[in-house]
Amino acid sequence: MRGIVCSLLAASLLMLSSCSSRVVLGDERFDVYLPLLEGKRVAIYSNPSGIVGDKVEGWCLKGGQEVTEASAGVPFGQPSAPGHPVVYGPHLLDVLLEKGVNVSAIFSPEHGFRGTADAGELVSSEVDPKTGVPILSLYSSHSMMPEASDMDKFDLLLVDIQDVGLRYYTYYVTMQHLMDACAAYGKQVVILDRPNPNGFYVDGPILDMQYKSGIGSLPVTMVHGMTLGELALMMNGEGWLQDSLRCDLTVVPCLHYTHRMHCTLILPPSPNLKDMRSIYLYSSTCFFEGTEVTAGRGTQWPFELYGHPDMEDRGFSFTPRSMPGAKQPRYRDQVCFGVDLREKPLKEIWSGQINLEYLADALAHMPSDSAFFMKNKHFEFQVGVPYVREMILARRPVEEIREKWKADADRFREQRRPYLLYRE
């Protein structure tokens, strides 16, 4: 049945235009960046998303297609027909080695170079068994910062990793640590840019730096709407690197991309973002990570539903199970009752706004206000300010909360403009 659905979907999508001409990723522009690597020891910062040109065969969809209602819920990696393997590649690492580039190290972020570790799970350094290149984890018990010995291994850092444009999505934090170190040690940084799937809007409060953490390290809005290349330019230009240093930075932009596009990715950027709909909902449903309500980790649809064992008045139910990417999900093997967002129209999700109605709705169906938010400050680390928790618990209208951060969003929208590489 899935094969039939995929075949029909693929046929219908052929009738739709892709994102402009075809978006050319930074990693495809060999003529621009290979000359920069000549005679250099090169370290790469990447993970499974570093597929050159987002090439994939055997999947229902193609990278770069305009996202539609029909395609938004198609799981990454679902084959176009039963028994047909989905093949990705080649990866940037393999291409560089094939072209004779001296790749001396790999830096890996949260979830690891292979992208299999759970959210927040520490990842050890190792040697890549395929290539023999050392993988230096920057999400380990040892350090979140590169060591001096790591910096001695390379002359130039090459970045190719898929981000989703949210302040609490940690890949940019690791990039910031690497840029800090490269600025201090005089190393070059080259970023091979990629589209931001949430790059079509800016929303949320600017981070109050008292809540600076591993899930929020820059004074930007929750949804910043920038690619990693643009964000790196802003870090450099605004003096946000450690000791206000600036690094020797080159960004290789995408071609034919604008911030108005909704382009399909080919791989989950992290284990629990399993389709495009989850990536769009994530800016609103990830807030449940700071509450006692689950956002669906341990199901096939994380961040596309939410619930709690005590919300028994809701008609929808699901049961989190242990699975890759969610080995110990909250409420494992317990029936949770809640809300299914999988049929929510994209037009509503693409409203250009963080949706706080989900939080307000969940609070209204919990047996006790005191049992809603976690006792720690995880929610504040996510949202970046103290007043959202207070106003949600006081049951203030969500538009009143949004109005409170409107000036932040407007100010950041203007502040970032000199660093944009693509049309808004």
Predicted regions and their residues:
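Short internal beta-strands
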Residues: 102-110, 192
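Glycine-rich, aromatic-lined ligand/substrate-binding cores of catalytic
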Residues: 255-332
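Conserved anion/nucleotide-ligand pocket segment
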Residues: 212-283
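Glycine/threonine-rich flexible loop motifs
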Residues: 163-175
